[in-house]
Protein backbone atom coordinates (compact mmCIF):
# COMPACT_ATOMS: atom_id res chain seq x y z
CA UNK A 1 0.00 0.00 0.00
CA UNK A 2 1.56 3.25 -1.14
CA UNK A 3 0.26 6.65 -0.13
CA UNK A 4 0.50 9.35 -2.77
CA UNK A 5 -1.65 12.46 -3.16
CA UNK A 6 -4.19 14.09 -5.43
CA UNK A 7 -1.12 16.14 -6.44
CA UNK A 8 -0.02 13.03 -8.33
CA UNK A 9 -2.84 13.66 -10.79
CA UNK A 10 -2.70 17.44 -11.17
CA UNK A 11 -0.11 20.10 -11.88
CA UNK A 12 -0.08 23.46 -10.12
CA UNK A 13 2.35 26.38 -10.15
CA UNK A 14 4.73 26.36 -7.21
CA UNK A 15 4.11 22.68 -6.56
CA UNK A 16 6.50 21.08 -9.06
CA UNK A 17 8.74 19.08 -6.74
CA UNK A 18 5.89 17.78 -4.58
CA UNK A 19 3.82 16.87 -7.65
CA UNK A 20 6.80 15.12 -9.26
CA UNK A 21 7.29 12.90 -6.22
CA UNK A 22 3.61 11.98 -6.17
CA UNK A 23 3.49 11.27 -9.91
CA UNK A 24 6.57 9.11 -9.32
CA UNK A 25 4.79 7.05 -6.68
CA UNK A 26 2.05 6.25 -9.19
CA UNK A 27 4.49 5.08 -11.86
CA UNK A 28 6.64 3.16 -9.39
CA UNK A 29 3.57 1.43 -7.97
CA UNK A 30 2.32 0.37 -11.40
CA UNK A 31 5.75 -1.02 -12.27
CA UNK A 32 5.85 -2.94 -8.99
CA UNK A 33 2.35 -4.25 -9.59
CA UNK A 34 3.38 -5.68 -12.94
CA UNK A 35 6.69 -7.06 -11.66
CA UNK A 36 5.28 -8.71 -8.54
CA UNK A 37 1.99 -10.09 -9.82
CA UNK A 38 0.28 -12.43 -9.16
CA UNK A 39 1.61 -12.95 -5.65
CA UNK A 40 1.75 -9.35 -4.39
CA UNK A 41 -0.99 -6.75 -4.64
CA UNK A 42 0.23 -3.17 -5.04
CA UNK A 43 -2.17 -0.32 -4.33
CA UNK A 44 -1.97 3.47 -4.24
CA UNK A 45 -4.18 5.71 -2.13
CA UNK A 46 -4.28 9.32 -3.38
CA UNK A 47 -5.78 11.53 -0.67
CA UNK A 48 -6.92 15.07 -1.21
CA UNK A 49 -7.01 17.52 1.70
CA UNK A 50 -6.44 15.65 4.96
CA UNK A 51 -6.16 17.27 8.39
CA UNK A 52 -2.53 16.63 9.37
CA UNK A 53 0.39 18.52 10.89
CA UNK A 54 1.59 19.60 7.42
CA UNK A 55 0.90 23.29 8.07
CA UNK A 56 3.15 23.14 11.14
CA UNK A 57 6.13 22.69 8.81
CA UNK A 58 5.35 25.54 6.40
CA UNK A 59 7.59 28.55 6.94
CA UNK A 60 6.10 30.95 4.37
CA UNK A 61 3.47 32.89 6.36
CA UNK A 62 0.93 33.45 3.57
CA UNK A 63 1.14 29.85 2.42
CA UNK A 64 0.77 28.60 5.98
CA UNK A 65 -2.40 30.66 6.53
CA UNK A 66 -3.86 29.52 3.20
CA UNK A 67 -3.19 25.84 3.94
CA UNK A 68 -4.59 26.10 7.47
CA UNK A 69 -7.77 27.76 6.18
CA UNK A 70 -8.17 25.25 3.37
CA UNK A 71 -7.79 22.31 5.75
CA UNK A 72 -10.08 23.85 8.37
CA UNK A 73 -12.87 24.36 5.84
CA UNK A 74 -12.97 21.00 4.11
CA UNK A 75 -10.34 18.43 5.10
CA UNK A 76 -11.11 14.80 5.78
CA UNK A 77 -9.36 12.96 8.61
CA UNK A 78 -6.52 10.48 8.79
CA UNK A 79 -9.11 8.04 10.15
CA UNK A 80 -11.08 8.44 6.91
CA UNK A 81 -7.99 7.40 4.95
CA UNK A 82 -7.35 4.49 7.32
CA UNK A 83 -10.87 3.23 6.61
CA UNK A 84 -10.22 3.36 2.88
CA UNK A 85 -6.97 1.42 3.34
CA UNK A 86 -8.73 -1.20 5.46
CA UNK A 87 -11.41 -1.56 2.80
CA UNK A 88 -8.87 -1.91 -0.01
CA UNK A 89 -6.77 -4.58 1.68
CA UNK A 90 -9.82 -6.53 2.80
CA UNK A 91 -10.87 -7.25 -0.79
CA UNK A 92 -10.48 -10.83 -1.98
CA UNK A 93 -6.92 -11.77 -3.03
CA UNK A 94 -8.15 -12.32 -6.59
CA UNK A 95 -8.62 -8.56 -7.04
CA UNK A 96 -6.65 -5.37 -6.50
CA UNK A 97 -7.86 -1.81 -6.19
CA UNK A 98 -4.86 -0.33 -7.98
CA UNK A 99 -5.58 3.35 -7.37
CA UNK A 100 -8.03 5.03 -5.05
CA UNK A 101 -8.47 8.80 -5.20
CA UNK A 102 -10.11 10.09 -2.00
CA UNK A 103 -11.12 13.74 -1.62
CA UNK A 104 -13.38 15.76 0.60
CA UNK A 105 -16.69 16.18 -1.20
CA UNK A 106 -16.23 19.97 -1.30
CA UNK A 107 -12.63 19.92 -2.55
CA UNK A 108 -12.28 21.55 -5.99
Question: Where does each model-flagged region fall?
Answer:
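Residue(s) in the substrate-gating loop at a strand-loop-helix junction
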Residues: 5
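Active-site loop immediately N-terminal to the catalytic Tyr-X3-Lys motif
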Residues: 10-16
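Catalytic tyrosine of NAD(P)H-dependent dehydrogenase/reductases that use a Tyr as the general acid/base
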Residues: 18, 26
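Active-site helix of classical SDR
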Residues: 21
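Alpha-helical segment proximal to the catalytic Tyr-Lys
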Residues: 33-38
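Conserved SDR Rossmann-fold cofactor-binding beta-strand/turn motif
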Residues: 41-51
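C-terminal helical subdomain
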Residues: 44-45, 64-107
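A glycine/serine/threonine-rich, flexible loop-to-helix segment
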Residues: 49-69
Amino acid sequence: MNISSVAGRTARPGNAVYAATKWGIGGWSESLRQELQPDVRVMVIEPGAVATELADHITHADTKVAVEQFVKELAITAEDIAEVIAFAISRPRRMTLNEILVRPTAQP
